[in-house]
A protein has these predicted regions:
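ATP-binding pocket architecture of kinase catalytic cores
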Residues: 49-152
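Conserved NTP-binding catalytic cores of kinases and kinase-like/nucleotidyltransferase enzymes
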Residues: 1-95, 225
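Conserved protein kinase catalytic core
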Residues: 63, 123, 219, 236-238, ...
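Active-site activation/catalytic loop segments of kinase-like enzymes and analogous catalytic loops
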Residues: 240-261
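Short Pro/Gly-enriched beta-strand edge/turn motifs at strand-loop
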Residues: 23-30, 192-203
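Active-site acidic catalytic loop and adjacent metal/ATP-binding pocket
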Residues: 39-48, 55, 90, 195-241
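Activation segment
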Residues: 61, 121, 226, 234-236, ...
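A cross-family kinase active-site recognition segment
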Residues: 124-184, 207
């Protein structure tokens, strides 16, 4: 679509107008709408006339299906009910739907939309304290415990992260690769080693839903309390994969130890 060739500011403006339209399905009008994240998805803060805040996420580039989004909603609602971890609540429309499917007029593209309750605080970001990382580690453990026996409905489905690229396109080894044969060969060795360990983990570990995107911009800190959000990348995996993602974003052995202990 030519829409996605437009300057980012124009895209945001158009999607903000679309957000106002979508909010009528939730019985919300005259809200203040501001873009807070624009990338894989467009996320808007919504403040109603009475001061209640929400986060509205429009999936603009995501390959997620309605079944994937339904799985995300089912899992987060399960965590809302059972978990000692603070997570945002999915918000239903007036028709009691948690997912809205609507055509964005300016792009002509059908987009899937979800809305969550607002989380107060600041992102932990890329300079977390050791205390914060200790809380993150505890929260990941609780999330895993609460998810180990959770079962999705028949209408919902998620990918399983047992392939090297986690269901994304292969630009390393396919015909689209720009690598030299020598580089490809070296990466193939790394690939084979990684898949050997991955296959072993999948053979010996419990597989359940994982968050799969634990980093400082998906973790909120407010008055000493941690919240976890952005469940858009969740899928079936092993617990070590959640930890590997979280550790990837850390810089020092002290940080690693704080997360893991």
């Amino acid at each position: 679509s030519e829409f996605f060739e437009l300057p980012t500011q124009e895209q945001e403006k158009s999607l903000a107008a679309f957000a106002h339209e979508l909010l009528t399905k939730y019985g919300i009008s005259n809200a203040k709408v501001s873009c807070i994240n624009f990338g894989f998805n467009a996320t808007f803060s919504v403040e109603t006339e009475t001061g209640v805040k929400y986060a509205l996420r429009i999936n603009i580039n995501s390959a997620k299906t309605i079944k994937n989004l339904l799985a995300e909603i089912e899992w987060v609602r399960h965590l809302n009910r059972t978990s000692g971890v603070n997570t945002p609540r999915p918000i239903a429309t007036l028709k009691d739907d948690f997912i809205v499917s609507a055509v964005h007029p300016d792009s002509g593209q059908r987009m899937l939309v979800v809305m969550y309750s607002w989380l107060e605080g600041k992102d932990i970001g890329d300079e977390p304290t050791l205390d914060q990382l200790h809380e993150v580690g505890k929260a990941i453990a609780v999330l895993h415990q609460e998810s180990s026996d959770f079962v999705l409905s028949n209408q919902a489905e998620l990918p399983t992260f047992d392939d090297f690229f986690w269901s994304t396109e292969d630009f390393l080894f396919s015909a689209k690769s720009k690598l030299s044969d020598a580089d490809k060969s070296l990466l193939q060795e790394a690939h084979d080693l990684i898949m050997k360990y991955t296959d072993e983990l999948y053979a010996t570990s419990q597989i359940h839903i994982i968050h799969a995107d634990f980093h400082g911009w998906n973790l909120m800190w407010h008055e000493g309390q941690l919240s976890i959000f952005d469940f858009d990348d969740c899928g079936f995996g092993v617990e070590a994969q959640d930890l590997a993602v979280a550790l990837y974003y850390l810089d020092t052995p002290e940080q690693d130890a704080a997360l893991l202990n």
